[in-house]
Amino acid sequence: MPPSSTEAIQDLIDVVSRLRDPDGGCPWDLEQTHASLVSYVLEEAHEVADAIRHGDDAHLKEELGDLLLQVVLLSLIHI
């Protein structure tokens, strides 16, 4: 049985938290800042918009996932 939406979101948060963990996390993820991620967020937002404009629901689902990943990553970077 697939996880509920709430469980899936928590799983994503857990994965990104591990990537950002100072003890063994991913070096690339650890060095990211809000400012360094701006271009990635904009790119994903444009890809979401393109999928909407083209009526490509399958691609939209994929791009929304990519944008959500960026939102979670941004939210786990402490200000």
Description of each model-found segment:
Residues 65-69:
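Glycine-centered tight-turn and secondary-structure capping sites
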Residues 70-74:
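Alpha-helical scaffold segments in carbohydrate-active enzymes
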Residues 62:
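Short, charge-patterned binding micro-sites
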Residues 1-59:
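Extended low-complexity intrinsically disordered regions
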Residues 77-79:
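Conserved small/polar residues in nucleotide/adenosyl-binding loops
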